[in-house]
Amino acid sequence: MTHDPLLNARRTGYTRDGFAARYHAHRPKPPSALLELLLQLAGTRRPQLVVDLGSGTGISTAVWAPHAERVVGIEPLDEMRAMAEAGDAPPNVSFRAGVAQRTGIPDGAADIVTCAQSLHHTEPAGTLAEIGRILRDGGVFAAYDYDWPPIVHWDANRAFDAFMDGVRALRMKHGIRREQEQWEKDEHIERMHRSGIFRHVTELSLHNVERCTAERLVGFACTISLVLPVLDLGLSDAELGLTALRETAERTLGAEGLPWYVTYRVRAAVK
């Protein structure tokens, strides 16, 4: 069957009412060190164009505003893109409807292309070919994903793991299967090597520190695609395991929250 990138994007479950706002409120931002690294690899302090594929609500797009002449986010889902456009992004940041395999960006126009927590949702051969087309010679592509949950407190993280175990059990009990086609993140680097598009491919880890409250940890849990179908079962928070997660997070993180250590796995390549 022919791969339909827009249909595949919709199967994430990210089109649910209220999801985009929850995602935007609780997901972490990329670390400043990542931007510095990509600027260094691209050999420029101020790129003419940065393209963010699968830009979602714009978290990973707007961070480039102070660093680039122009930033374009490509996002297939209207609901996520509407949240991005409703924000206070500067005038040099814009968002377009599109998929990673068909961006509408001119040949060789981009200095930097990023996929933040999104490459595993896209068919890789067509996506990498499009990235190769829109990148200039010497331009840089980076796919980066964070480990979840980020580390905040051992007991809160243990409660998060228990919640996810419960989610998997509920999926099995109710016969919920993943509809969306996905590609393993651990295989990104090998696919980038095999594409023949890039002169140099490397992999590293970076981290960021943000603030995590109980509300944020629970909200983050409710933005994970594996969790979303379980939330539709009509179960109580106690039956879902959210009550136990919330109570542990409130007890361990306190009213002000604690530092949240977010590890990013970065796969970067130079064309």
Locations of the language-model features?
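Conserved class I S-adenosyl-L-methionine
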Residues: 1-54
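Class I SAM-dependent methyltransferase SAM/SAH-binding core
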Residues: 57-102
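A short acidic, Gly/Pro-enriched loop at the edge of an enzyme's catalytic core
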Residues: 103-112
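Short catalytic micro-motifs in class I SAM-dependent methyltransferases
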Residues: 117-118
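A short, conserved alpha-helix within the catalytic core of class I
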Residues: 122-131
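Conserved Class I S-adenosyl-L-methionine
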Residues: 125, 183-271
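Conserved catalytic/acceptor-binding region of the Class I
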Residues: 132, 136-210
